[in-house]
């Protein structure tokens, strides 16, 4: 009985420790000055730093390297660093996935660089993948994870959300499943990697009509779908920090498929925008900040050149609702793209790293 009681205390203590450290705050960082400055200012709030430092081509050649100042500060603060390795396009990744020799070269380079630089591990950020490469992506991920684990390193992967697990009816839904969402076998990937970062953002982009970067129901649906296949302790919820600004772009000259004549065509555009720039735009053109209660997101519209333009962005309230969702679902953490675009108020919500 005494031993059972002792084991029970150990289990309770372990659960309490996990609760104290979750959700782990994973932040992405690019090499832009704004992104690096944000990291330098808020490093104590970050649980894992994921910088965009590496890429791989069709031959398995890994290129890139760390920002020395960023890496030095992270190491001084004992902040885990897990850089991204990104693919060089759909065709290059397809070739890599079919070439065992190239994969071995990539894996050896990742292990070597991780040990040399003192990284926690590496994150795969492979996007724009054909759904027909689903199995080979899972296989390469397993090979890489096995090699990393053998050296005491970790492998994570960023995945495009893919609920409900099949293509929709419309042409756009079919295209985005074939070329973006369908390549990720969450169950197979979860068996190999240490963490899956669910990229629950870019619901609406330049490819779509104006709308939230990550609407509430869409976010919840994709999170719950992922939880069917991924253990909670291996799942991180994507929370965007940025927004989009939709406007009427300059008409473009293209050949009409029917007449074969060059004609002007519409060019509705959507530009990536930081929260700071969004608020500046609203002030300049007298936009009134709105709150969409259904989608838990901030937005406004302005008039410029007599045309209505739309902005959906992430303010502190938008971030907080999704942060609380990660807490309520008791998942490992959240992953936010990207430092330098955030509302400064989010940092008041986050505890210091333990």
What are these regions (language model features)?
Residues 20-109:
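Glycan-recognition patch characteristic of GH18 chitinases/ENGases
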Residues 49, 124, 196, 237, ...:
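Conserved, mostly hydrophobic/aromatic
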Residues 4-15:
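Sec-dependent N-terminal signal peptides
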Residues 29-43, 98-115, 177-189, 313-327:
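Short, acidic/polar
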Residues 30-33, 54-58, 87-91, 128-132, ...:
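Solvent-exposed loop/turn segments at secondary-structure junctions
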Residues 243-324, 346, 354:
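Glycan-binding loop/region signatures in secreted carbohydrate-active enzymes
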Residues 130-278:
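Substrate-binding surface in catalytic domains of secreted glycosidases
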Residues 57-86, 129-158, 217, 344:
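Aromatic-lined substrate-binding rim segments of carbohydrate-active enzymes
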